[in-house]
């Protein structure tokens, strides 16, 4: 029995010493033989092997993207292990570093090329379009939740929200941000429940930077990025006609985040838009609409929250979103929500 215990102890000791003596191995990363399009969709897989020919364990490896925001995401996956790079929307040089407990840190650099395509010819570059169902759902959730929240903001309403266009711009921009604790504190939006963010990109890390809105007509071309075609400010007419698509004059076809658009011929500020929220983030009901009245003389205006059923029977027929009202131009949907096939 003593011999048995001694042998067992030697085995444990040998295993322990072997672990301590294990030296980091050099990792071989297959060189990329192609450029990647910075379209927010493309994927590149690079097989990984240890220099001694062994296959590394993906669970023992970590990868870090050394490039700035907007350049994509990287992970180590599979068996045999591969470095998987998922393109962002910012073109340029992307460097990734792989390391592990028993692997010497290694880096690989790839080049990503710009994506200037515009699948619909509507002026929105494809790199801004939200290709996945989950991203479109995330945008709709945040856009409507933020707009609806501001209806309850009172004195905490951001100063920039002073008319219907400003409410659209603010809610659109904030919906595309990363929604962490720092954002919630800075925007006074801590009451909103946690939800998934848009994954393809986050504002302002895209080729248009903070200039989200198209202010000139036409299909997208590369020079639009530098010639003033995109801007941070756009009035409501430009927001809707140059950044959204017509859906229907049947308001019941509106989805959460769609715009209800009017032209009031009798008013000085002729164009007006409302946001169809649908189901509320703050209470019962599934047909809520939020809008800013705009200023009237010395009155700064206010954000109102009404149900679509009430709007359809509005005392003033000019505000009823029904086909028989010539002032109602229809339901519009943001171009970034158009589905690229």
Predicted regions and their residues:
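A short beta-strand micro-motif common to beta-rich folds, especially ectodomain repeats
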Residues: 91-101
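A short beta-turn/strand-edge loop motif at beta-sheet boundaries
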Residues: 52-59
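Extracellular/luminal low-complexity segments enriched in Ser/Thr/Pro
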Residues: 79-92
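...with weaker cross-activation on analogous glycine-rich loops/strands in unrelated enzymes
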Residues: 192-298
């Amino acid at each position: 029995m003593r011999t048995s215990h001694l042998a067992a102890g030697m085995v444990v000791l040998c295993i322990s010493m072997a672990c301590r003596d294990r030296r980091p191995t050099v990792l071989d990363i297959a060189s990329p033989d192609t450029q990647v399009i910075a379209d927010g969709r493309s994927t590149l897989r690079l097989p990984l092997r240890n220099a001694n020919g062994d296959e590394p364990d993906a669970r023992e490896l970590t990868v870090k993207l050394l490039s700035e925001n907007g350049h994509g995401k990287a992970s180590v996956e599979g068996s045999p292990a591969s470095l998987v790079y998922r393109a962002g929307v910012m073109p340029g040089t992307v460097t990734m570093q792989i390391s592990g407990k028993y692997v010497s840190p290694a880096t690989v650099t790839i080049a990503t090329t710009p994506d200037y395509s515009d699948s619909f010819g509507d002026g929105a570059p494809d790199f801004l379009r939200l290709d996945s169902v989950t991203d479109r759902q995330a945008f709709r959730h945040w856009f409507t939740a933020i707009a609806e929240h501001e209806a309850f903001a009172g004195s905490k309403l951001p100063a920039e929200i002073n008319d219907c266009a400003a409410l659209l711009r603010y809610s659109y921009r904030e919906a595309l941000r990363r929604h962490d604790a720092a954002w919630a504190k800075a925007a006074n939006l801590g009451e909103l429940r946690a939800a998934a963010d848009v994954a393809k990109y986050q504002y302002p890390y895209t080729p248009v930077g903070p200039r989200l809105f198209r202010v000139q007509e036409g299909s997208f071309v590369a020079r639009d990025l530098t010639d003033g075609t995109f801007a941070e400010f756009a009035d409501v007419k430009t927001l809707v006609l140059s950044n959204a698509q017509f859906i229907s004059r049947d308001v019941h076809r509106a989805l959460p985040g769609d715009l209800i658009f009017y032209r009031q011929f009798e008013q000085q500020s002729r164009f007006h838009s409302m946001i169809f929220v649908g189901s509320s983030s703050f209470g019962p009901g599934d047909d809520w609409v939020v809008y800013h009245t705009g200023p009237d003389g010395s009155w700064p205006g206010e954000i109102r929250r009404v149900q679509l059923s009430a709007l359809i029977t509005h005392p003033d027929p000019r505000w009823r979103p029904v086909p028989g009202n010539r002032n109602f131009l229809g339901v519009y949907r943001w171009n970034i929500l158009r589905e690229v096939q």
